[in-house]
A protein has these predicted regions:
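Short alpha-helical segments that sit at the start of domains
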Residues: 1-14
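Basic amphipathic alpha-helical segments that dock to polyanions
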Residues: 46-52
Length: 146
């Protein structure tokens, strides 16, 4: 599969923005410390989230804010913003099956449609998962710590 760590970094970032924004200036350095990820990567993810209209972010400015309510941000929105597989598809198929082999000649036609079904099902499920649910779970877990 071709979903990278950028997806979970983005979920972490958005959760931090919501949790800390009322009391703290949320900067890329702050987010880097929370995620344990290099600030350059954090800024790259923030730029992608900004381009998708999920956050408001200007490098060197007064912090990062959310552009829309958490219940209007889905896992799918984040996936499309930072990790969308675009035209190549979620699954990477080996490129050179042998045309001299009967299986090699026919494997693509037997498998491609099914892989597309799996990707569509995953994307549809991602559309149902909202960041408001993630943040609620994180807040409940933090409350239990105290």
């Amino acid at each position: 599969m071709q979903i990278t760590g950028r997806f979970t970094i983005a979920v972490h970032i958005i959760t931090c923005i919501d949790y800390f924004s009322p009391d703290h200036q949320v900067t890329s350095g702050f987010l880097s410390a929370s995620t344990g990820v290099n600030p350059v990567i954090v800024r790259g993810v923030l730029s992608q989230l900004k381009e998708a209209g999920i956050v408001n972010y200007r490098q060197g400015a007064s912090g990062v804010t959310l552009n829309r309510p958490l219940d209007q941000i889905s896992f799918y929105d984040i996936y499309k913003a930072v990790d969308s597989v675009k035209d190549e598809g979620l699954f990477r198929f080996h490129e050179h099956p042998s045309p001299d082999c009967p299986v090699g000649r026919n494997i693509h036609s037997a498998v491609d449609g099914r892989l597309d079904q799996v990707q569509t099902a995953m994307e549809n499920e991602m559309k149902e998962i909202k960041l408001s649910d993630v943040v609620q779970d994180v807040r409940e877990q933090i409350t239990k710590e105290h």
